[in-house]
UniProtKB/Swiss-Prot annotation:
Protein name, entry field: Pantothenate synthetase
Species annotation: Maricaulis maris (strain MCS10)
EC number: 6.3.2.1
Enzyme class: ligase
Quaternary organization: Homodimer.
Primary residence: cytoplasm
Ligand binding (ATP): 35-42, 152-155, 181, 189-192
PANTHER family given in the database record: CYTIDYLATE KINASE/PANTOATE-BETA-ALANINE LIGASE (PTHR21299), PANTOATE--BETA-ALANINE LIGASE (PTHR21299:SF1)
Binding site for (R)-pantoate: 66, 158
Note: The reaction proceeds by a bi uni uni bi ping pong mechanism.
Binding locations of beta-alanine: 66
């Protein structure tokens, strides 16, 4: 467990006491929810929050509700001491460490389900996932009650799901997005990258190149169907398995027609190397 010298709360009451004191001083509150195993992408979100808000809360909670049986809940990396040091270095004002028992006590029965941007893509592969995300984020928003919440663009579908959640449930929260953090070869930073062996790590960098080419083809006037087929073929050659490679409307994640794009879109992919799943996305704009 982290030391008392690092400001943290493990109970809802302790969290609310600290946040209430900030509110009494008329300080704005930013919130960065995480599942731990923090990397530079998470740290950049905390720094973005610090630039926008007077005080920042970051949570570390591996949410069991968004893992299906057989997924990597037990294997998911847990590096709390290192996480606390990174958050402290980034000037996070409070680390919130709820327990599964506190979040989902005996008899817990509520859940949140969304449609709209939650349909397809990740949901087609992991149908439980966004229900778990929406439920835990709703609880965390009610517990922290921030003015702003910060999410990374790497999980683009999740970002749009959270924005829809805030809109539909009337949360008075501004959701801000941080750019995707990347390694030198363009691989999107992810806690699950730690699962990759050296050969897989080398191969993983191809995802960035495939999506860049996909976005460039669409922006250059290629038809959506042709550009998608080319990107899908490249991903199928590069990776052990492909869950999806698609172009969707950037604002809603609605499916597109077969022709050239006429609006901002997002190209999104999920692939596998061994048992490790990689996701990424990029923006593409219609030809000028």
């Amino acid at each position: 467990m982290i030391t008392q010298q690092i400001p943290h709360a493990t109970t809802i009451s302790a969290l609310r006491t600290r946040v209430r004191s900030w509110r009494e001083d008329r300080l704005s509150v930013g919130f960065v929810p995480t599942m731990g195993a923090l990397h530079d992408g998470h740290v950049s979100l905390v720094r973005l929050a610090k630039a926008q808000c007077d005080r920042v809360v970051a949570s570390v909670f591996v949410n069991p509700k968004q893992f299906a049986p057989g997924e990597d809940l037990d294997a998911y990396p847990r590096t709390l001491i290192d996480d606390a040091e990174k958050l402290t270095d980034a000037k996070c004002d409070l680390i919130y460490l709820p327990t599964p028992e506190a979040m989902y006590p005996d008899g817990y029965s509520a859940g949140v389900t969304l449609k709209g941007p939650a349909l397809g893509l990740e949901s087609a592969i992991r149908p439980h996932f966004f229900d778990g995300v929406a439920t835990v984020v709703t609880k965390l928003f009610n517990q922290v009650r921030p003015d702003m919440a910060f999410f990374g663009e790497k999980d683009y579908q999740q970002l749009l799901v959270i924005r829809q959640l805030v809109k539909d449930l009337d949360f008075p929260i501004n959701v801000l997005a941080g750019e995707t953090g990347r390694d030198r070869d363009g691989l999107a930073l992810s806690s699950r990258n730690a699962y990759l062996d050296s050969d897989q790590r080398t191969r993983a960098g191809q995802l960035n190149l495939i999506l860049k080419a996909f976005a460039a083809a669409l922006s250059g006037g290629a038809s959506t169907s042709d550009a998608t087929a080319t990107a899908l073929a490249a991903a199928s050659d590069a990776f052990d398995a492909v869950d999806y490679v698609e172009a969707r409307c950037a604002a809603t994640l609605a499916e597109l027609g077969d022709g050239p794009i006429d609006r901002p879109v997002r190209v999104l992919a999920a692939v596998r190397l061994g048992s490790t799943r990689l996701i990424d996305n990029m923006a593409a704009n219609p030809p000028a």
